[in-house]
């Protein structure tokens, strides 16, 4: 029996998000369309409700609890998202100590929302999130090659151990997707990103909202 054949069935799986989607890989992750746009301004999801900075791209580099409501009720927020320049797909967490199935589920959720936004004429830059090598097989599935991708480095490279995992994951993603542009939310030191720039990849770096706020407090 399939869900679509059940009368008066509440769509608890949010199947409407992937209507007419094509899927990639054994996990059937929704595929996204190519996006080559380059954002010039970012705004966190939590601030879009009182903002008129519609020339910004919305990002989700925040605690999951802040934007879980988008997954719970995406139709409610669509008109607001459509006002802005575009969206970087949701950054649902992939912690290394999370069960792998939860990491896969969060990757699916991000892609499903991204696909749905694209079908509603919202430009979407895919966010790539990985944990350790277990997540490599699916972290970039469904993402077109040679486009623009986004990566969050905030909180991932300060600690030596975390930095190693980040570098390994980034290298895998770049080799797999061969992007033209990488949007980096957080610091983008040349020790990590320099070799990609030398190979012709454009790095577009944005300071994290935390670092911007902290620098203002320190300088005040």
Feature names for model-found ranges:
Residues 49-50, 70-215:
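Eukaryote-skewed repeat-based solenoidal scaffolds used as protein-protein interaction platforms
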